[in-house]
């Protein structure tokens, strides 16, 4: 029956190698609804903008999805957004699958044993530059709206299944607190400067390395940050 099918599907769900992958309710410690940045800056947690096109790469946090936008319409001008890892997450020669549920609930996926290299759509590419990253490239004028993204080992996508009516249903909704803790290994924010540690081992959770300390302003309030981002 349907309940039995869902149970079996859940049992076979592979581990998502990505952090902050559920864009219906993303980890967004910097607190903005839209990020327009040039190369090397972060918007939502763990996703780094890689673009020389200052203020043409937008990451928008919308109601129920995140959009990546290349607002430059001149052919040949592309942008990247990437997630980096501390270690190699996809062993050489092992099949890996990337899958995306878009804003409309449609799921598409691609499998490769030599590093993800997927033409997701006209002018949109998802690939691994190496075993320690996942990159999304958008050509001029392109937009990608996502509810969720998954990178996993194996030759099948397990991000979602179809119900009896053919609708795609996510196989799991991640625990927000767990995802926040994973992101806080790389970035933490404090309302009070005096309670922000300086040694990585004094943070909770412990940070990846000794962080760079700074401030950000959200609305009219100053917050105190610690970044150990890659």
Report each predicted region and the residues it spans.
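Short surface loop/edge beta-strand patches of beta-sandwich-type extracellular domains
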Residues: 10-14, 77-88
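Short, tryptophan-glycine- and acidic/Ser/Thr-enriched carbohydrate-recognition patches
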Residues: 25-52, 214
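Phosphate/adenylate-binding glycine loop and adjacent helical scaffold
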Residues: 73-78, 103-124, 130-132, 188-230
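Extended extracellular/luminal ectodomain segments enriched in beta-structured repeat modules
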Residues: 86-98, 131
């Amino acid at each position: 029956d349907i309940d039995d099918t869902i149970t079996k599907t859940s049992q076979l769900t592979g581990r998502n190698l990505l952090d902050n992958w559920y864009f219906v309710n993303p980890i967004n410690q910097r607190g903005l609804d839209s990020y327009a940045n040039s190369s090397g800056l972060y918007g939502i947690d763990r996703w780094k903008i890689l673009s020389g096109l200052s203020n043409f790469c937008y990451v928008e946090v919308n109601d129920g999805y995140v959009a990546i936008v290349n607002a430059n319409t001149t052919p040949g001008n592309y942008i990247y957004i990437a997630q980096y890892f501390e270690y190699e997450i996809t062993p050489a020669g092992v099949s890996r699958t990337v899958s995306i549920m878009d804003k409309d609930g449609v799921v598409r996926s691609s499998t490769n044993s030599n590093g993800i290299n997927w033409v997701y759509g006209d002018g949109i590419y998802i690939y691994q530059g190496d075993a320690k990253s996942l990159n999304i490239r958008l050509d001029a004028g392109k937009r990608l709206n996502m509810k969720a993204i998954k990178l996993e080992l194996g030759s099948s996508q397990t991000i979602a299944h179809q119900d009896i009516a053919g609708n795609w249903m996510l196989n799991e909704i991640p625990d927000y607190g767990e995802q926040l803790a994973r992101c806080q290994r790389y970035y933490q924010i404090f309302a009070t400067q005096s309670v922000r540690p300086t040694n990585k081992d004094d943070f909770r959770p412990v940070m990846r390395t000794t962080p760079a300390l700074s401030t950000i302003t959200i609305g009219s309030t100053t917050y105190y940050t610690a970044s150990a981002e890659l």
